[in-house]
Amino acid sequence: MHKSLARHYRIRMKFQLRRRWLLLLLPVLLAVVCASFSRPEYKPPTRPELRKRVNYLARVIGEGAGPGTPLAAIGEQTPEWTLFSLSFAVYAFTHLAAQDSGFRAEAGQLTGRAIEVALSEPVRGPFEYVYRPEWPDTTRSVLYLGHLALMLGCHRQLAPNSRYAPLHDAVAGALYRRFEREPAGCLESYRGQRWLPDNTVALAALAWHSRLTGSPYAAAARRWTARARQQWREPGTGLLVSQVDSAGRPTEEARGSMLGWGIWFLAQFDAELAAEQYALFRRHASTNLGVLRVYRERPGRYTTGLGDLDSGPLILGYSIPANTFALADAVALGDARNAARLQRLVALGRRTVETSTEMRYGVRVVDLPVSPLAEALLLWAELPPAGARVRPRPAEAGQ
């Protein structure tokens, strides 16, 4: 009797899951048909839109990460999302200040406040192994320290007399020394877990420190990319793997959410490797639908399901993070056609919530709390870094 009920329950749940994913997929398929009659053109956010998006993030950052705040709420899903909401907002503010000098002072103030929140216990605490309040660089996690160091570098660029300069030097120095003595070549995000994309953030931060101060820390990035080229590419695709063990041996295959993330930060210290990985990512993990291009979480797999924390829900193997990060890569690397395709795809999946002064986002069809992470990520993704220019690319076979 119990076995029969359990079997009935499994069949029912399977049917409900299939129905749910069909409901998710149907609007996308209809949109593809409608969109196929027009040609994509990348359109950066307008100034009024940017103002509202910045206003929302400024309010969230100003409220801090204490109980009852949006940052605390997003952190209930995973503490990483609180940190990323702050760090990617800072990267976006820095990009915007590079385009609009009139925003520079405000960007500096917002970045300073974001760093203050990132140093607070609710954000910092989940990443600590050992911690001394006077020296945040004793935190073990490269995930936390990498983003903190890059945020500090952004503040130093925006405010040359940054009050955080000593901390920036301390954190960058600690990271550099750890990379020098790490046999695996990649530092830990958590105990026993070494993800390549988390390390690319820290290495981008070290390269940025070198540009700002003349330090030798960019050498760590050069050593890392040399090893990545030799040891951390998949034999069949050439794509960088996602994770290595304590000896530096690959332990997890290439994944769209990891690649998309890593390529953007790679471009900050090795433009050649970033461009190569971007082309391979597009070739092996994406499908061209004319005016849309969609990226899979795992090359060659078309699974539909709940996915995991990094991928989120999968529809025929395609994931939201893989496509969001691919948009950022396309904008940063100047691939205007692909940026337009991905911008349109992202627009199909997001629901805009707008007031007279603010703008934030939700997810269509499913109830998935994403604010303020979605706002920070999309603002970062849609704004080219300083010196980048979104430009048309020559036509390519299979583009």
Q: Where do the PLM segments sit?
A:
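Hydrophobic alpha-helical membrane-insertion segments, chiefly the h-region
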Residues: 29-38
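Well-ordered alpha-helical segments within folded domains of soluble proteins
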Residues: 81-97, 140-156, 194-210, 250-269, ...
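CBM-like carbohydrate-recognition segments
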Residues: 42-55, 59-82, 123-128, 136, ...
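Structural helix-adjacent loops and short alpha-helical linkers that scaffold large soluble proteins
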Residues: 40-51, 96-112, 155-169, 210-223, ...
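Extended ligand-binding groove/face enriched in aromatic
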Residues: 79-81, 85-87, 92-200, 383
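N-terminal Sec-pathway targeting helices
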Residues: 9-29
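Intrinsic-disorder-associated, low-complexity terminal segments enriched in Asp/Asn/His/Tyr and depleted
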Residues: 2, 8-9
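Extended ligand-binding clefts on enzyme/binding-domain cores
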Residues: 143, 182, 193-321, 334
